Swiss-Prot record:
Protein name: Leucine--tRNA ligase
Species of provenance: Streptococcus pneumoniae serotype 19F (strain G54)
GN (gene name): leuS
Localization terms from the record: Cytoplasm
Residues bound to ATP: 613
InterPro entries: aa-tRNA-synth_I_CS, aa-tRNA-synth_Ia, Leu-tRNA-ligase, Leu_tRNA-synth_edit, M/V/L/I-tRNA-synth_anticd-bd, Methionyl/Leucyl_tRNA_Synth, Rossmann-like_a/b/a_fold, tRNAsynth_Ia_anticodon-bd
Pfam family of the protein (one): Anticodon_1
GO cellular component, one term: cytosol
CDD domains, per database record: Anticodon_Ia_Leu_BEm, LeuRS_core
Top enzyme class: ligase
Motif range ('KMSKS' region): 610-614
Family: Belongs to the class-I aminoacyl-tRNA synthetase family.
Catalytic activity: tRNA(Leu) + L-leucine + ATP = L-leucyl-tRNA(Leu) + AMP + diphosphate
Amino acid sequence: MSFYNHKEIEPKWQGYWAEHHTFKTGTDASKPKFYALDMFPYPSGAGLHVGHPEGYTATDILSRYKRAQGYNVLHPMGWDAFGLPAEQYAMDTGNDPAEFTAENIANFKRQINALGFSYDWDREVNTTDPNYYKWTQWIFTKLYEKGLAYEAEVPVNWVEELGTAIANEEVLPDGTSERGGYPVVRKPMRQWMLKITAYAERLLNDLDELDWPESIKDMQRNWIGKSTGANVTFKVKGTDKEFTVFTTRPDTLFGATFTVLAPEHELVDAITSSEQAEAVANYKHQASLKSDLARTDLAKEKTGVWTGAYAINPVNGKEIPIWIADYVLASYGTGAVMAVPAHDQRDWEFAKQFDLPIVEVLEGGNVAEAAYTEDGLHVNSDFLDGLNKEEAIAKIVAWLEEKGCGQEKVTYRLRDWLFSRQRYWGEPIPIIHWEDGTSTAVPESELPLVLPVTKDIRPSGTGESPLANLTDWLEVTRADGVKGRRETNTMPQWAGSSWYYLRYIDPHNTEKLADEDLLKQWLPVDIYVGGAEHAVLHLLYARFWHKFLYDLGVVPTKEPFQKLFNQGMILGTSYRDHRGALVTTDKVEKRDGSFFHVETGEELEQAPAKMSKSLKNVVNPDDVVEQYGADTLRVYEMFMGPLDASIAWSEEGLEGSRKFLDRVYRLITSKEILAENNGALDKAYNETVKAVTEQIESLKFNTAIAQLMVFVNAANKEDKLYVDYAKGFIQLIAPFAPHLAEELWQTVAETGESISYVAWPTWDESKLVEDEIEIVVQIKGKVRAKLMVAKDLSREELQEIALADEKVKAEIDGKEIVKVISVPNKLVNIVVK
């Protein structure tokens, strides 16, 4: 057989690995550890697509490489299995979301195993397993005990027709719900919050210690949004009331010509004049219909209403009007801002819209034309005139503190984490509310609080989750006869994914989240690979929970993930017509290397786009494995380009990777393999070992594969192959194409054992030294010849060889040599006349 029969070989080795538990996590305490983590998937009904294996293959290559280097490797997989799609499916079909989820997991697992990933399936976790979410609930009870989980009335997007609140992302720009197109209103509801803000400073500072992409760290820094400025107190004219604004530029206070409160601010009704009451009430109602996202859109037209009241500017005593506007959010800062229209574009647009004064306090711009947002020396600012930004801020803060109308303040953009959902398919929150007004956490001995099985998962209609319909589960009585109700909200999908990497370390422990010694052994995660779309929320939440568990003494490290790598996106093949509109792949035919619309005959342009069901360009890995083999898919996805690049899927590229594997198969099975080394491949082999080793370490898998191809080309030029080089090459390709490597290893090594733990090959540095080197010969400054010569020849020897070359002789024939300049290992320059 002169080709790689993947249909026979791949299932054979997958069966062997499963039967022998080949990838069971090593526990030899004398070995170093390596923890390679994938972002575990949500097991959707659609199954895996070819984007999933890109990151999974990367961690698998590293895991196989580290095993061969003598490491204990922890390389697990599990399921982020709670989530809205399963609940929606259950509501639409009447099926149990647990059954639907179990079927999806079985399909995902089948697909993953068909790709030859070296996961330790003994450590599989599932966020919907009560034995798992017992510890999710345990973490929540600890947060509750420490005052970091609390209840609050917060405004939510309420849809009366759906009987539930929906997320900001589910509200359409016209203020209706994405599902059903129903009206959405903002109304306060009791919600569970987690006090992530208590960790803001640590979450920010500890980013500096992480080997993460700088772009991801910047996204987290911006999300946390630390601002140093001042709180300034404004009194309301003619009343005993006052309000506080936070500003990062207290030095511009002399330019504050109006103030703006959020429509929901607690002072609004109290200070609104009778003449303005109707306009204010109408505006408040309109604001309640908009999502926070829509309200803060910089591009939207500025709207607002004057309350009829005035504030007193504390620095100059001037009366300035108090407005309400929906771009100010009650949940952000103090829910009030001072407006300096000369130096803030949004304030400037608002002032122009409503004909409010604009006073320049920083020189350098033309504030009649636009806000001047650069720095400049202060003007029109009394005791701040002539000062720069830093000097003026220090002086005004000292003045505000002395006068008792302000103080220096650090604030964060980060808000506390809204942790409850009015849904069925999630972890029950282990809290009981008693009729005497107290609430208590479910004791650890009674965890897990198991999600009850029910067919009735429709919304309750009261704003509570469907669990409110289940009276038997809901109502409890204490030993002293006091009645209580269980919490009906469930946890968000983020909960189970915030700590799953810890459970992999000790997945069957019934006494604790994980054993302390094992956590010390394995943490932190050495590399975490996943999509950049999780840059903020998941990674920030996981870091928060980890730091909390560190404070409890549960985990030994301050951070969970030492190195993070975001793989790129695999784009689908798609086509555009002359208008730029995308055409579905089933409407395209290929003729003579070009693409045409089946119905119109129009020639189409090929253009990569995100894979989507609507474009019919999603590639199923099952189809690729069937036609080309799992090893081909693995090699192709790693060879497409840099791991972090977004690259279009190509059938031709897939075929090229398959041809390469067939060449590898023929090289090892057809070439005569000898016990003696004739030295012909010394340099090529040692170069390949060195390059592949270094490139795997730096995740440059595409260049590692290119180097493997270089070796195959060199080996094919020789009649015979030295056995140690054949073995070493098979080991080098094993992390990329493990099934092929296992099969070839048996033909060469004849040990009957897996290649997985055979020691990684090493290279001989002395064999990398070049014996020969190319030099150029220049005549009158122009290159006339290139010669291969022995390395490190003297100037005289170089000159002698150059002048003896036939091409050079012809060029200088009949000419007088003025001088010859020789530079060893580089060039010979002959000057003639």
